[in-house]
């Protein structure tokens, strides 16, 4: 059984580099790359990706090494300003970055282009030996016809109001969509939400929109 941990933030490379001889530079390990690291007595699978929009790595290793690696990281953490964080901290950072949450912001019923994730599909790329990717025709059709809804990110001006999900999104007093997720953006100083809005195919600007406050 594997245990997963993560080191995230601007000092994450320096901290992790102090624990291994593997070169963690951007040139050697670019974004999304994976490698095995020797950290003390453990072999760790390191994936250079995070859910917070910052430099960082997700670490996978046998669960019997979980306490050992946690204590090893904690023993050197102070000089790198290491702090423990929980899921609410991660959720706050990811929504500021507009990272979608599967199950709230995207599901298997949403179109990749409506979700603003067109960069992850390459319809112009030469097909592999297995043929075109699943959903190729749907992407081409949407590209030709345009999106009728799209994900947008919202920041509340009032810093005292929270967003959760399902709040209506209004433009000129009319509901044009609902928030799919929300959290407080501590770096931005206000609640942040992601939500789908209705739009005309080819429409690129929505003007000023707002989220209706609860209560």
List PLM regions with ranges.
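Conserved, structured C-terminal
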Residues: 3-212
């Amino acid at each position: 059984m594997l245990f997963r941990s993560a080191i995230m933030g601007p000092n994450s490379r320096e901290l992790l580099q102090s624990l291994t001889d593997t070169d963690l530079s951007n040139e050697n390990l670019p974004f999304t790359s994976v490698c095995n690291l020797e950290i003390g007595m453990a072999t760790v699978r390191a994936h250079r990706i995070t859910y917070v929009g910052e430099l960082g790595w997700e670490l996978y290793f046998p669960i019997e090494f979980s306490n050992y690696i946690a204590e090893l990281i904690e023993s050197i953490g102070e000089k790198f300003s290491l702090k423990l964080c929980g899921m609410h901290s991660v959720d706050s950072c990811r929504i500021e970055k507009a990272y979608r949450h599967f199950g709230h912001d995207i599901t298997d019923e949403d179109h990749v282009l409506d979700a603003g994730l067109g960069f992850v599909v390459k319809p112009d790329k030469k097909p592999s030996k297995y043929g075109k990717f699943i959903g190729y025709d749907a992407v081409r059709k949407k590209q030709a016809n345009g999106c009728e809804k799209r994900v947008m990110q919202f920041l509340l001006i009032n810093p005292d109001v929270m967003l959760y999900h399902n709040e209506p999104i209004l433009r000129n007093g009319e509901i044009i969509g609902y928030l799919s997720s929300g959290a407080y953006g501590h770096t931005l100083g206000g609640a942040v939400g992601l939500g789908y809005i209705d739009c005309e195919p080819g429409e690129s600007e929505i003007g000023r929109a707002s989220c209706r406050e609860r209560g």
